[in-house]
Curated annotation (Swiss-Prot):
It comes from Kocuria rhizophila (strain ATCC 9341 / DSM 348 / NBRC 103217 / DC2201). The gene is ruvA. The lineage of its organism: Bacteria, Bacillati, Actinomycetota, Actinomycetes, Micrococcales. Residues 152-213 are annotated as: Domain III. This is Holliday junction branch migration complex subunit RuvA. Keywords: Cytoplasm, DNA damage, DNA recombination, DNA repair, DNA-binding. The RuvA-RuvB-RuvC complex processes Holliday junction (HJ) DNA during genetic recombination and DNA repair, while the RuvA-RuvB complex plays an important role in the rescue of blocked DNA replication forks via replication fork reversal (RFR). RuvA specifically binds to HJ cruciform DNA, conferring on it an open structure. The RuvB hexamer acts as an ATP-dependent pump, pulling dsDNA into and through the RuvAB complex. HJ branch migration allows RuvC to scan DNA until it finds its consensus sequence, where it cleaves and resolves the cruciform DNA.
Length: 213
């Protein structure tokens, strides 16, 4: 089985491309989505699926992403869905929308694919319900502190004025201990003024700006 091909693109057509590998020109059928990203003379790597069916010439189908290949191969297991129709589904919907439609039982989404009518769309959703699922969202670490979006802006402003990053961070923490509502507001200008005021009045805890005399 040919799982992938890597080589120089020799030709890009409306429905296929030719990739030169070790002196051989390999014809790869692909969706417009994949073909649009290929350039003649450039090196590419395509995930491939080799399809050989009775009474039909074997064909090699290529995909820019492994997820596209997975959608294609799984759809071939649905009764009445051939490689051309499966390829069209990958092109029209894309992997994420195809998974989302199946998870939601949205058979109408598949009727937008050429060659798939209402009956076939319902069959696709039913047969793939337990085969194509949406990926689990990333799990956030428990008790992981969230850095406010304004923090980096205030630190950059303070270091630009000559304060060290260490003193800038300490100044923010100490200033907000006395005025915690500023952190909730997220007002960069007000937070910066408060930190500068704290840095200017604190004694023995911070250094003067390194870039100023």
């Amino acid at each position: 089985m040919i799982a992938s091909v890597t080589g120089e693109v020799a030709f890009v057509g409306a429905t296929l491309a030719v990739v030169e590998v070790s002196g051989f020109g390999i014809e790869v059928h692909a969706s417009p989505r994949t073909l649009s990203g290929l350039r003649v003379g450039a090196t590419t790597r395509l995930h491939t699926a080799y399809i050989a069916r009775k009474d039909e010439a074997p064909l090699l189908f290529g995909f820019a992403q492994g997820d596209e290949k997975e959608i294609f191969t799984v759809m071939l297991g649905v009764s009445g869905v051939g490689p051309r129709t499966a390829l069209a589904a990958v092109s029209v919907l894309g992997p994420e929308d195809a998974r989302r439609a199946i998870a939601a039982g949205d058979d109408k989404a598949f009727t937008a694919v050429p060659g798939i009518g209402p009956k076939s769309a319902r069959r696709i959703v039913l047969e793939l319900a337990d085969k194509l699922v949406l990926p689990e969202p990333p799990v956030q670490q428990a008790n992981q502190p969230q850095v406010p979006v304004w923090r980096d802006q205030v630190v950059d402003a303070l270091t630009g004025l000559g304060w060290s990053e260490k003193d800038a961070v300490r100044g923010i923490e100490d200033a907000l201990q006395t005025q915690p509502e500023l952190g909730d507001s997220g007002n960069v200008a007000e937070i910066l003024r408060a930190v500068l005021s704290w840095l200017g009045t604190s004694k023995g805890t911070t250094h003067a700006p390194t870039g100023r005399r």
